[in-house]
Amino acid sequence: MDASCNAKPAVVAVVGPTATGKTALGVALAQQFSGEVISADSMQIYKGLDVGTAKVTPQETCGIPHHGVDILTPEKTFSVADFTALAGEYIQDITARGHLPLLVGGTGLYVQSLLYGVRFTAEKAPDGLREQLTAELEAIGPEAMYAKLQAVDPEAAAAIHPNNKVRVLRALEHYHATGKRLSEQKADSLPPERPYRSLVLGLDFPERAALYRRIDLRVDKMLEAGLLAEAEYVWRNRETFRTAAQAIGYKEFFPYFEQTAALDACTEKLKQASRNYAKRQLTWFRHMDGVTWLDAGAADVQQTALRLTQEFLSKG
């Protein structure tokens, strides 16, 4: 890759719902095309949260550099604007060294904001707004707060789980601070052209049952790998690990630690929450322009992805 010209940097993205094999495909592409992986996962940035976030292991990296993993302690916050700025630096550095940036992950807002060049305003929320909304949430509960978001920004609400209090609060905070819905912000903040030349490969299974079986199996393997201890670590620090405490994979076990639910019930709740999350991920990526979808269960999925990537790079 020639970094000396003024052409847009080339970026290949591997996206899709959880448990579709994105990590393995990203590594395979990196091995073939001298690539480096940039994580597009909103939870894998946190140190010490390995099992519940399905963080890539040293063995799984196969020596391929992975950026955007293990960079913050769990009490820190990390916004989509932070991600686009950091990932942009990674892309510039990787491209300058003659390597291919590979964006791999399932956080659709991260992928779309980076590749489509969404600009984020520097407007700061009025002092006390977050505290006011938080107090309101505690007073009326998450369901009523989610209903408020549905009333002012149904499009944003559709992409957020009703129990994800952090994202519900952020969306409401944005609306009250700017007078605009997040969907309007997206439209207003799109620049005339995209900052990168990109190929977006989406992984999914033709049969939804196949994906759900993989999700259930992944949860079982996570428990064997120490998920419960990690979830207890988050539970004990839930007042400071606010983002992690809302994450799928941890919060489902809080009733078990509080001795109000059995472990089996919490495990089933996690499996259901993971399946629901996968559906929301698919909804997001299906609405994204320019995604080339691949059958994650096909025997030749890697070969197909390699061929498409080769064709994409040859056009540069």
Language-model regions: role of each:
Residues M1-G316:
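Phosphate/pyrophosphate-binding catalytic cores of soluble transferases and nucleic-acid-acting enzymes
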